């Protein structure tokens, strides 16, 4: 793949932010952003994925407490309790600190997420309201993004499917600090690319059966008439249209 099409990534988290057992790995990316991985084979993913480009967050404070039942992890924002076994509703929970809600700021693994919604991939065939993917902010103070099925980005710019059966989750526990949640989301996933300047100028697009010669003549005519166009679109005739 050409170099200009490759995506810059820094997928390795600081080793000091990792709490790991034989079959699990918990990465404290920030005080409110926790990565949760579980693999029966003890194999974890350090490469970038379609979701996560940058896991190299700066060091943050956390505390690990070992108990008879497993481990507890405390940060300024969340309190995680885990029995160090396969993820389950009884064995993995995270409480968002700060008295966000009396009953709803505690998440157990497997519970349905009630957030404020994210985005939709396309508006094709939409007619009215459409379902949205999960977002990263919630009135309950937390949300969860499941990265278990994302494609992996390779160093040469191509992608490949992930190994099946590995759980890879990102827990966002920011309470009502929505701005900070979105800030860390954008760091993890990469900034949204800005539109190139030329795309903000005038466009010419017409569904018309041009030839190469007639299209070039049209561009020259625009130039002669001092009509400023920064983008010229061939419309549908860049591919076959008469296929019957």
Descriptions of predicted regions:
Residues 64-199, 206-207, 212-213, 219-224:
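Catalytic and substrate-binding clefts that recognize carbohydrates or anionic sugar/phosphate headgroups
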Residues 4-5, 29-68:
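A low-complexity, Ser/Thr/Gly/Pro-enriched, surface-exposed linker/loop concept
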Residues 95, 103, 228-244:
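Aromatic- and carboxylate-enriched substrate-binding clefts and catalytic-loop regions
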Residues 1-14:
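Short, Gly/Pro- and small/polar-rich lid/capping loops
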Residues 199-201, 231:
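Structural preference for beta-strand elements that scaffold enzyme active sites
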Residues 18, 224-225:
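Ser/Thr/Asn(+Pro)-rich, low-complexity disordered segments
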């Amino acid at each position: 793949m050409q170099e200009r099409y490759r995506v810059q990534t820094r997928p390795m988290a600081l080793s000091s932010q990792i709490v790991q057992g034989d079959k699990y790995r918990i990465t404290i990316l920030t005080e409110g952003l926790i990565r949760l991985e579980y693999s029966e084979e003890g194999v974890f993913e350090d490469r970038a994925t379609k979701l996560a480009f940058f896991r190299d967050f700066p060091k943050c404070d956390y505390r690990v407490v070992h108990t008879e039942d497993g481990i507890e992890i405390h940060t300024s924002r969340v309190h995680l309790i885990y029995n160090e076994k396969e993820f389950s509703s009884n064995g993995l929970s995270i409480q968002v600190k700060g008295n966000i809600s009396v009953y709803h700021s505690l998440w157990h693994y497997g519970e349905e997420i009630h957030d404020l919604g994210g985005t939709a991939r396309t508006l094709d065939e939409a007619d009215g309201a459409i379902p949205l993917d999960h977002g990263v902010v919630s009135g309950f103070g937390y949300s969860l993004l499941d990265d278990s099925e994302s494609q992996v980005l390779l160093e040469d710019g191509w992608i490949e499917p992930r190994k099946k059966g590995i759980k890879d989750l990102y827990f966002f526990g920011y309470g009502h600090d929505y701005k900070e949640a979105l800030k860390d989301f954008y760091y993890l996933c990469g900034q949204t690319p800005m539109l190139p300047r030329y795309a903000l100028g005038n466009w010419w697009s017409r569904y018309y059966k041009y030839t190469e010669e007639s299209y070039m003549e049209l561009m020259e005519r625009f130039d002669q008439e001092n009509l400023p166009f920064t983008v010229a679109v061939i419309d549908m005739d860049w591919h076959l249209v008469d296929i019957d």
